[in-house]
Amino acid sequence: MSKETLVSTCNTESATGYVWSLYFYKIDRRSKEQPYKFYKVRFKNEDYLMSYAKSLMSCVNQFQIGPIESVQEYDGENTKVSCDKLVTDNELVAAQLTTFVTALGKASDEKVKGKIHGYVLFGVSQTDASKTITFIKSANPITSLTNKKAVVFTTTADDELEMFSDSVCRLYLNTDIVIIDKIMYTFNHNFEALFDIEKTMAKVKTAAIDQMLATTSFADPATFKTYASQYTSNRTFITLKEERLNRVRDKRKRKVVAAMLKIELDESGEFIIDSKEKAAHLIKYLCYKIFKDGETNDVLEASTINTLTI
């Protein structure tokens, strides 16, 4: 979905075409099977929720979607001028998102006790029940106006000041995540903690290293595996692609890659990986984090666009 389509979906006019519900959620990672707990929020006046939905969609459109330059596939390196997207069955989020949605479907009517970790505004199309839109905000909406920095009073019927100590609910006019049908759009990396994808990233890293080893392009596979396993950024491995794996499978193209990265080859034409640095450079290359500038021949790191000294 392009930015233009995202703009046309999130706007004040579209809000009236949905039936809206609001839910608070809590997270308890000690419960491994179902860490999420949802609570249905009810309003004294039903018009309040529609009013909030309109305001939220208007502000998201103007202040979050408007400034971005593009919508891109999630690669763990948001440039701050783009919106990331993932299909909801992406292995990074699929399992936890399913658990999240399952918990939402079993929302409780009980009064919330303890700290709230966030809330969900869920809309179902009035003309097509299969068409939905979901806004997720990872922030506690319940706050106290009286705190260490301020004391708050309210005016009584007798025009006197009385200390106001009750908690209030503050719903933000921005969002961390928008899910439209089967695509999840993220404006920051808060979803990584929400869906606990660090564990999933670790599995992606392990699978990626196995794919690299399967190219049979290493003089000492065990040494490369050791160095690769010590590579600290799991998110780098998200962008591993078959095209670059195929390059190092091909002995002729492997020589070009080795020359670019200053990695030696043995007599059989296999990579000699004898340091963490060389392993890191090859990993970054295979995961599209390193490329060669066609004009200057400088070797650049994609996430920072800094020339590497290798």
Model-derived regions, located:
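Short intrinsically disordered terminal tails
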Residues: 1, 307-310
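Acidic, low-complexity, intrinsically disordered interaction modules
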Residues: 33-302
